[in-house]
Amino acid sequence: MQKVHVIAHTHWDFEWYFTRQQARVQFAYHMAEVLQALADNQLDSYLLDGQLAIVDDYLQTNPDKRAAMMRFVKARRLFIGPWYTQIDEMVTSGEAIVRNLQLGHKLAADLGGVMKVGYLPDSFGQGQDMPKIYQGFDITATVFWRGMPHEKNARYFYWTASDGSKVLAANIKNGYYVGVDLIENDDTAALLHRIATDTQAHDLALPVGGDQRAVDFNLKDRLQYANQQTSDFELVEDNYPDFFKALSTSSDLPTYQGEFIDPSASKIHRGIYSSRADLKHLYDRLEHLMVDVVEPMMVIAAHQGIEAQDGMVAHIWRAIARGQAHDSSGGCNSDATNQDIYQRGVEALQLAESVRDYLLRKLASGAPASLNVFFEAHQRCGPFIKMVRSRWQRVASIFHLKMKMVKSSRMKS
């Protein structure tokens, strides 16, 4: 008998063919249902789509619900994180992916705990370095849907990166919405045999939820009905961390390496790689400005006694993270939504440029004569700001060099 771990969840794009403002209104009412279902024990647990952006928006307008959320998070009944937004891996830089996870982890920890599962149920293809990135955050398991080719057809497997990093992966081949049939269709056998294909594992995952779907308050009744209809499967309410703990005892799981960007089993929407190039250019420019210029300058400034503006940096990275959600970065949205995305990017870029310009003026005009910091050049480097002081002028120049701080005597003029 195989064990089916039934996982109640929502998939909640914070913007798509609807605007962020429309989504915020609907999510506020959805959270009322979630908290009620958990308080009344109509659900054992619930997954908020693995992202904190929707929670961030919700708590801005519903701060009185923070305590209730924290109570359920700490009790391992409400699962949040590890992401800030549900990114697209193929049009997002590696640094932005890491920052997205950092932000998601921080906010989830502040609310009581982060779900240590790399949960990306709708990202349009899977990057080859994701196991490496996940291991850097002590994430040992991942859930995704899109990109698996027919020749690599295992539902559950170990996914490795080129450096040997490994995570246990669940490919939800039938989509994150497959479990809706458990609620709306009495043909339980057909559903269970569908999710049992391409695996010999004893433990199976059955996600129950969908895009902006209302809470299924009758889940327990439907589980009872399903268990009465089958002798081949046992269905239990569960969550992804406990599912992976059970799955990890399987001894016959295959190992795959590399990226998964094949549309043979699920759509990966290749058109999003080039659609709305204006958005992609804007956010790419913003990412590079932060990573290659603003943050290095802030380090230099801090060395000279100029206080770092960590809150401002975090604010800009929040805007970047919202621009890297899979629909937002893909530009596959309504015109109104794309206008919102573009305007957020413009405002964040203006803020980043203002930080850069201020620090440049401050450093160029006020660097002490005894400035004792310089930077060595290395190959394979990114740009940084090198401050050159001479007897007659102070010049700020951008070189394509790697930043490395070393001790030095006073620079010669």
How does the language model describe each region?
Residues M1-I385, Q393-S413:
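Catalytic-domain carbohydrate-binding cleft regions of carbohydrate-active enzymes
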